[in-house]
Amino acid sequence: MVSKALLRLVSAVNRRRMKLLLGIALLAYVASVWGNFVNMRSIQENGELKIESKIEEMVEPLREKIRDLEKSFTQKYPPVKFLSEKDRKRILITGGAGFVGSHLTDKLMMDGHEVTVVDNFFTGRKRNVEHWIGHENFELINHDVVEPLYIEVDQIYHLASPASPPNYMYNPIKTLKTNTIGTLNMLGLAKRVGARLLLASTSEVYGDPEVHPQSEDYWGHVNPIGPRACYDEGKRVAETMCYAYMKQEGVEVRVARIFNTFGPRMHMNDGRVVSNFILQALQGEPLTVYGSGSQTRAFQYVSDLVNGLVALMNSNVSSPVNLGNPEEHTILEFAQLIKNLVGSGSEIQFLSEAQDDPQKRKPDIKKAKLMLGWEPVVPLEEGLNKAIHYFRKELEYQANNQYIPKPKPARIKKGRTRHN
């Protein structure tokens, strides 16, 4: 706590020092201009120059310097709604610099709340939230949730966790720790400060389902020792912890079971089907489909998910709620759709079917409709066009920085991937 206070003090001193130096520099410049002005006046009296034109010539560079300084030191933020002290909440988002977390940050900031983002940048990126840095309602903390955090908040959105196969398979122990120890720490924080906690769980708790579509009362069909178990079982344990704290300690909890989500700020090479297909299509490479492509998925756009998370947090629903799009497509249909939207000549390449790849996944969202008044509203093609536009820009950015990412498959066994 002392070291954090010292850092804030040093930061404040540095800001004051910078302002002082800028002030001195401007005063020196004005003094120089004034000296030239006096000299020019003397020259004019001798009939050698017209002072009016020279004043304008000298003042214009000063105006330019002031404009440049304003651009450098005045950060323009997205529009933020004003909330009274009574209505404004102090909100913590773990994993807030990640794909979904950064969009949730945008939503809550623009709604007028005070938002603290905690991220260890294992998969999150500072770029995703840098447009809020410096805003009085925003704070970014580099912190791993497996370590305790001491902060006063009203709500906690616990999103911290690797969520794509390459990331959680690369470090399964870290994934387990984040979903168990990290969740335990956030529940402890919620208990201490009386905050409400929302756990970002997953449709993976249903495993390879034997019931279709999947409703919240389905217990699932999960392989507890498979290659994905670190994530699937980690989330199942996290849910158990939430309800244990609710029953024993009276902590208010909300649990969102999130289905496949896509949109801007996804990692380009995270191994998910959306990012893989878009990247392959944009680069003119074959779109890789594992198995026959008859497996089904239902994809929701990220803004729909964010609205669902906020609605759930502010509701009285303490039991798990599915958040997903019930519009179902086969993987093959999805590959063809992305190919057409990109306008790509890429072929579709069929590879061996992956281990533990669910054959069907579709959420039953009756509960979300009835109890939250929520359902997805962004059409699939509209969302995909936004994602494609983002990926085009990312490719340009990477090209300018001499790096072109390649689609990264999730390693399961013998180099195989699965559709996510």
Swiss-Prot record:
Catalysed reaction equations from the record: UDP-alpha-D-glucuronate + H(+) = UDP-alpha-D-xylose + CO2
Single biological process term from Gene Ontology: D-xylose metabolic process
Name of this protein: UDP-glucuronic acid decarboxylase 1
SUPFAM superfamilies: NAD(P)-binding Rossmann-fold domains
UniProt source species: Pongo abelii (Sumatran orangutan)
Pathway: Nucleotide-sugar biosynthesis; UDP-alpha-D-xylose biosynthesis; UDP-alpha-D-xylose from UDP-alpha-D-glucuronate: step 1/1
Residue numbers carrying Phosphothreonine: 94
Enzyme active site: 231
Obligatory cofactor(s): NAD(+)
